Amino acid sequence: MNEILVTGGTGLIGMYLKQILPNAKYVSSKDYNLLDINEVKKMFLEIKPKKVIHLAAIVGGVHHNIEEPVKYFEENLLMNTFVLKESFANKVENFLGILSSCIYPDDIKEYPIKESELLNGAPHKDLFSYSYAKRCMAIHIEMYNKKFSTNYNYIIPCNLYGEFDKFDPIKGHFVGALIEKIATAKINKEKKITLFGDGTPLRQFMHAKDVAKLISIMVLKNKFYSMNVATNENYSI
């Protein structure tokens, strides 16, 4: 499966996908700088993929998004644009981008969320830059399909967790950051922890390995679709 290129190979989903599809070509920032168009061109020239699973992203918690909005917007936008552009230039047959449920409008009241709701409102203000960079990739993919009849798709997972997450209050996903906060409080013998949120937002959670399994099924069956990936259970945070 060397014709399959997986960016973000050392990330949360990438590490699980490697267990399921070990023969794909997994790359990380140590291999290629996806913010450099020349590095991206080099990557495609050397690997010559037929399928691209684009997992790479600049990710972090809410507070880091608030502190570094330009970084989250600009770097994700550049990375996604370069990888998608070179996928087309190198005649990649299938492209699958990974988005995030935070790109949906913040005021959605009905669950499960429908894919048609994507552009029906603004995302949460604290994740504005990251969310719009991811929205841009969805639009970019759809424009390629409309103009050139490509088979490019994206999936939108809910909040993910797993052993390969960053257990860091700044850069971790919600569950990973929460575990780190509780563990730190336990070590420091603190009697309570402070969580942000008033309990009204609803979130869905899924193990990252389940998303990796879905991606592997798409790859092995050569059937790709754009869709949400989530559970039916909602939790208030």
Question: Where do the PLM segments sit?
Answer:
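NAD(P)H-binding glycine-rich loop region in Rossmannoid oxidoreductase-like domains
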Residues: 38-77
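Conserved catalytic-site region of short-chain dehydrogenase/reductase
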Residues: 61-62, 97-112, 129-135, 147, ...
